[in-house]
Design a protein with these regions (language model features):
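Electrostatic cytochrome c docking/interface patches
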Residues: 29-61, 75, 135-158, 245-247
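The canonical Cys-X-X-Cys-His
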Residues: 56, 60-71, 107, 139, ...
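Detector for the c-type heme attachment site
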Residues: 67-74, 100, 112, 144-145, ...
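Axial heme c-ligation environment in periplasmic c-type cytochrome domains
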Residues: 21-27, 88-100, 110-136, 146-149, ...
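Extracytoplasmic/periplasmic/luminal assembly and interaction segments
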Residues: 53-100
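Short glycine/threonine-rich turn/loop motifs
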Residues: 71-90, 162-193, 248
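C-terminal single-pass membrane-anchor helix
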Residues: 1, 238-278
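Hydrophobic secretory-pathway targeting helix
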Residues: 1-47, 64, 106
């Protein structure tokens, strides 16, 4: 009986340490994580977010296609990849699915002033001052009409992060060469293979929504992803960081069950052996 009391005391001490001390230490070391703002309420958006797709295509070809392609509609960028890298130190994204993953209010603000929307004064794309608010609405309507629907987490991650970040464990490599990324951002962006284990999921959601809230001073621009897109990216990073978690958890339950049975048998055996002595 004495041994059982000692075991119970140890269990209580461990549980208090795990559920009491550890969360407190984490809160002291990491502080409060800001909640994501999917309304992008800091942006004063005057541009339209709807319009005529046909007019939008004309405006896209005239104003965007020199740097950006649109594979979904057979439009190739006027500038090839190597020329773009030489000019901007980063590959301009294909915009086929941008309207499916980025909030349309953010997208409108981004087209008008990329530096302000991304909170990155060094962002390579210039403001589109020649476009009226109505023009922006037409472009967004066009982008929405060609975008693929219901992209999964992997697809969104590649769309949103693949120009700068590699995920080598999944054989996904950044479109932009490392030396150019270093020149553009100041350092090579980290590989995302195990980011889902290295960082808490709540932190990742906040960081993706607005990098400055998670890491003030970072050179990563704000992406403007919708809540759904962000959650899919975080879920994907979590899944690939520990792809065997479900199998391990199932096995773990069997191991715990086995240990419980063995503890019970050991205790019963001990009582039987020592009952005449005690």
């Amino acid at each position: 009986m004495k041994e059982l009391k000692i075991l119970l005391i140890l269990v209580v001490v461990v549980l208090v340490g795990y559920w009491g001390i550890e969360p407190y230490a984490h809160s002291v070391m990491h502080g409060e994580v800001k909640k994501p703002d999917y309304n992008y309420s800091d942006l004063k958006i005057t541009a339209a977010t709807t319009g005529d797709p046909a007019k939008g295509k004309e405006l896209f070809v005239a104003n965007c296609a020199s740097c950006h392609g649109l594979k979904n509609d057979g439009i190739n960028p006027g500038m090839d990849k190597n020329a773009a890298i030489a000019s901007f130190n980063v590959v301009p994204p294909d915009l086929s699915n941008i309207a499916a993953i980025v909030d349309h209010k953010f997208l409108a603000a981004f087209i008008k002033n990329p530096q302000q929307a991304t909170e990155n004064p060094k962002f390579a794309m210039p403001p589109m001052a020649q476009l009226s608010d109505e023009d922006v609405g037409h472009i967004i309507a066009y982008l929405s009409s060609v975008a693929k629907k219901n992209l999964d987490g992997k697809e969104i991650t590649i769309e949103a992060c693949g120009r700068c970040h590699s995920i080598k464990y999944q054989k996904i490599y950044a479109e932009t060469p490392a030396e150019n990324l270093k020149a553009y951002l100041g350092k090579v962006p980290p590989d995302l293979s195990v980011m889902g284990k290295a960082k808490e999921l709540e932190y990742l959601e906040t960081f993706i929504n607005n990098p400055q809230n998670g890491l003030p001073g970072t050179s990563m621009p704000r992406l403007g992803l919708t809540k759904e897109s962000t959650e899919k990216v975080v879920a994907y990073l979590d899944q690939i960081a520990d792809p065997h978690r479900e199998q391990r958890n199932k096995l773990g339950m069997w191991v715990i069950g086995y240990l419980v049975v063995m503890v019970g048998l050991t205790f019963a055996w001990k009582k039987k052996i020592w009952k005449n002595i005690h």
